């Protein structure tokens, strides 16, 4: 089996400079989903027909082992787009899947089932089908082509478009989902014989079906497992609706594998994310990129985790952001914490509210619970970092590193000016500005002398 994906459309209703098939759904281009579903349908020999901004599309998928064909006239119609890829199947004796690049909901399972249906008809009825059309029933079929069949069978007579349908035909709820499998020699024959529409000048794939039926090449319908598979993406609102369907499918996939997802309509889980059983995910969470969440962890409301590893039994409290970092076992992050740039938070460490950690290694059992900035630093195990502590790592030209040993104490509102080393068991008194290395076990105090002037405060407050 081979596949041709049609991705040449102008996408004018998107009102965008970007090709429609490159608009993203859960962090992936729309076309990625179609390619992935085709491959999940056990088809690896794939051609993509491009047209509008062809180079952008080809560049985006240059590493996907695809064959590209260019439709010279993007307004030539769907059959003209398939004809642009004729060299891909002109000498091929098998079947070809034709699917739109804006149909990301047609599942790999459905594609496999369509192939199996062709095989069963050949095996049990002795009929080599000319084609199979994916269909579904919609309660409101307005705008879709209606499937006209022989009564009591799945044999298609023709597909009639909404504008051409009689009142009786408009009452039909079975519609064309826009995905087809054709026997390649019959397809090629039909493509060369059909005529352009006298109204638009376009060549339509639905005319291929009518041609095959008239030639005696049997075409049958195959019902999609879910009506949503018929949803194409023609507008930004369609994109939002399709994204919501995929979002819920992904949430359900993980729920069926032992993950608790609260209020799944609000949870964003991208396709490359991996989650182990007994993870609990609260509303408004975003899990992005190649994030991995290990068993027993809890991800609090509104948190965003991208391209990061969260190990076992971690608690990420509300509205925390973690990017390109690792959170080790039993650590606690947040609420309102930010961890980024390849930081590592050690086992049982606590990074609390309004603490930012950037490109730093935080040891086991470290506590930084409030209002701190830790940048370009290594902090040894069991060290305490008080509220308001800042690691000053930038002098206006370059970044410098800091090292704090194990079991040290950094008092509240301390300023550590890098490059600097603070030894094990060192104690820095609150409010200190530290610009020299502190030896192991030493006490460092850096404060201006406090002066008290009796009675002066009241005088100032009462002054007119």
UniProtKB/Swiss-Prot annotation:
The keyword Transferase applies. Residues 258-464 are annotated as: N-acetyltransferase. CDD domains: GT2_GlmU_N_bac, LbH_GlmU_C. Keywords: Acyltransferase, Cell shape, Cell wall biogenesis/degradation, Cytoplasm, Magnesium, Metal-binding, Multifunctional enzyme, Nucleotidyltransferase, Peptidoglycan synthesis, Repeat, Transferase. Coiled coil: none annotated. It catalyses: alpha-D-glucosamine 1-phosphate + acetyl-CoA = N-acetyl-alpha-D-glucosamine 1-phosphate + CoA + H(+); N-acetyl-alpha-D-glucosamine 1-phosphate + UTP + H(+) = UDP-N-acetyl-alpha-D-glucosamine + diphosphate. This is Bifunctional protein GlmU. It comes from the Bacteria. NCBIfam families: glmU. GO terms for cellular component: cytoplasm; membrane. Its cofactor is Mg(2+). Homotrimer. Pathway: Nucleotide-sugar biosynthesis; UDP-N-acetyl-alpha-D-glucosamine biosynthesis; N-acetyl-alpha-D-glucosamine 1-phosphate from alpha-D-glucosamine 6-phosphate (route II): step 2/2; Nucleotide-sugar biosynthesis; UDP-N-acetyl-alpha-D-glucosamine biosynthesis; UDP-N-acetyl-alpha-D-glucosamine from N-acetyl-alpha-D-glucosamine 1-phosphate: step 1/1; Bacterial outer membrane biogenesis; LPS lipid A biosynthesis. One of its GO terms (molecular function) is magnesium ion binding. The active site is at residue 370. Binds 1 Mg(2+) ion per subunit. One of its GO terms (biological process) is regulation of cell shape. It comes from Aquifex aeolicus (strain VF5). Residues 1-236 are annotated as: Pyrophosphorylase. InterPro entries: Bifunctional_GlmU (IPR005882), GlmU-like (IPR050065), GlmU_C_LbH (IPR038009), Hexapep_transf_CS (IPR018357), NTP_transferase_dom (IPR005835), Nucleotide-diphossugar_trans (IPR029044), Trimer_LpxA-like_sf (IPR011004). Catalyzes the last two sequential reactions in the de novo biosynthetic pathway for UDP-N-acetylglucosamine (UDP-GlcNAc). The C-terminal domain catalyzes the transfer of acetyl group from acetyl coenzyme A to glucosamine-1-phosphate (GlcN-1-P) to produce N-acetylglucosamine-1-phosphate (GlcNAc-1-P), which is converted into UDP-GlcNAc by the transfer of uridine 5-monophosphate (from uridine 5-triphosphate), a reaction catalyzed by the N-terminal domain. It is an enzyme of class 2 (transferase). Its main location: cytoplasm. Residues 237-257 are annotated as: Linker. UDP-N-acetyl-alpha-D-glucosamine binds at residues 6-9, 20, 77-78, 145, 161, 176, 234, 340, 358, 373, 384. In the N-terminal section; belongs to the N-acetylglucosamine-1-phosphate uridyltransferase family. In the C-terminal section; belongs to the transferase hexapeptide repeat family.
């Amino acid at each position: 089996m081979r596949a041709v994906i049609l991705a040449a459309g102008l996408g004018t209703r998107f009102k965008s400079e970007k090709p429609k098939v490159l608009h993203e759904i859960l962090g992936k281009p729309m076309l990625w989903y179609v390619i992935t579903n085709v491959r999940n349908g056990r088809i690896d020999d794939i051609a993509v027909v491009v047209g509008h901004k062809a180079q952008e599309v080809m560049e985006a998928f240059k590493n996907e082992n695809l064959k590209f064909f260019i439709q010279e006239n993007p307004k030539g119609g769907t059959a003209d787009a398939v004809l642009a890829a004729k060299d891909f199947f002109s000498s091929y004796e098998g079947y070809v899947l034709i699917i739109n690049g804006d149909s990301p909901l047609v599942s790999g399972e459905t594609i496999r089932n369509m192939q199996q249906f062709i095989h069963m008809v050949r095996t049990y009825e002795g009929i080599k089908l000319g084609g199979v059309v994916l269909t579904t029933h919609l309660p409101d079929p307005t705008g879709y082509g209606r499937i006209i069949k022989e009564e009591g069978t799945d044999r298609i007579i023709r597909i009639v478009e909404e504008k051409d349908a009689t009142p009786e035909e408009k009452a039909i709820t079975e519609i064309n989902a826009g995905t087809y499998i054709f026997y390649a020699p019959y397809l090629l024959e039909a493509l060369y014989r059909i005529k352009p529409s006298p109204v638009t000048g376009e060549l339509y794939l639905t005319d291929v079906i009518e041609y095959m039926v008239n030639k005696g090449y049997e075409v049958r319908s195959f019902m999609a497992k879910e009506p949503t598979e018929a949803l194409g993406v023609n507008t930004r609102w369609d994109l939002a609706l399709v994204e919501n369907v995929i979002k819920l499918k992904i949430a359900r996939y993980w729920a069926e594998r032992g993950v608790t997802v609260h209020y799944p309509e609000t949870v964003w889980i991208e396709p490359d994310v991996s989650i182990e059983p007994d993870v609990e995910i609260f509303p408004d969470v975003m899990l992005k990129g190649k994030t991995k969440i290990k068993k027993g962890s809890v991800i609090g409301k509104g948190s965003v985790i991208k391209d990061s590893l969260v190990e076992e039994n971690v608690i990420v409290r509300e509205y925390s952001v973690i990017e390109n970092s690792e959170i080790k076992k039993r650590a606690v992050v947040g609420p309102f914490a930010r961890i980024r740039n390849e930081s590592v938070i050690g086992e049982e460490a606590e990074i609390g509210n309004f603490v930012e950690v950037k490109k730093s290694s935080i040891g086991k059992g470290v506590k930084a619970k409030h209002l701190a900035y830790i940048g370009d630093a290594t902090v040894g195990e069991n060290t305490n970092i008080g509220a308001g502590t800042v690691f000053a790592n930038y002098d206006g030209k370059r970044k410098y590193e800091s090292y704090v040993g194990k079991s040290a104490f950094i008092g509240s509102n301390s300023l550590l000016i890098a490059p600097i080393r603070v030894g094990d068991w060192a104690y820095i008194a609150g409010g200190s500005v530290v610009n020299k290395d502190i030896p192991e076990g030493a006490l460092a105090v850096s404060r201006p002398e406090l002066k008290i002037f009796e009675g002066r405060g009241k005088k100032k407050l009462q002054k007119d």
